């Protein structure tokens, strides 16, 4: 039996997280299971503003922005796992542990962002995230987020 995918388009993403260009780093959600997992993508292009300085001779997508893309994916999963986003609230990136960068992400790459909900305790949500390019892990980390008013 084939499972039905649950995509989320860019318009809905923008109702769930407050980020906008150039800091909106999730292009679309391929699939998600509320309370469990989310698979999203970020298409990295040479037109990203960051590439004018990182680095002019060899454009490499910054690791901190890969982590930010994973954090945005956790916010989307968080809101899709609960009653949704209320007025003037968001998930704040609270901490990161065990971050590893294994390969550079270059213009033209499609990053597949995979996040998994691990647990919630006292309003803090813990996730495991991986960014993959061509099926290979380029970054992994444990991320903590907190749902808070703006």
Swiss-Prot record:
Subcellular locations according to the entry: Cytoplasm
CDD domains for the chain: FabZ
GO biological processes: fatty acid biosynthetic process; lipid A biosynthetic process
Enzyme active site: 54
GO molecular-function terms, A-Z: (3R)-hydroxyacyl-[acyl-carrier-protein] dehydratase activity
GO annotations of cellular component type: cytoplasm; membrane
Pfam family, one: FabA
Coiled coil, from the record: none
E.C. number: 4.2.1.59
Broad class of enzyme this protein falls into: lyase
Catalysed reaction equations from the record: a (3R)-hydroxyacyl-[ACP] = a (2E)-enoyl-[ACP] + H2O
Keywords linked to the UniProt accession: Cytoplasm, Lipid A biosynthesis, Lipid biosynthesis, Lipid metabolism, Lyase
InterPro entries according to UniProt: FabA_FabZ (IPR013114), FabZ (IPR010084), HotDog_dom_sf (IPR029069)
Function summary: Involved in unsaturated fatty acids biosynthesis. Catalyzes the dehydration of short chain beta-hydroxyacyl-ACPs and long chain saturated and unsaturated beta-hydroxyacyl-ACPs.
Family under the similarity heading: Belongs to the thioester dehydratase family. FabZ subfamily.
Name assigned to this protein: 3-hydroxyacyl-[acyl-carrier-protein] dehydratase FabZ
Gene: fabZ
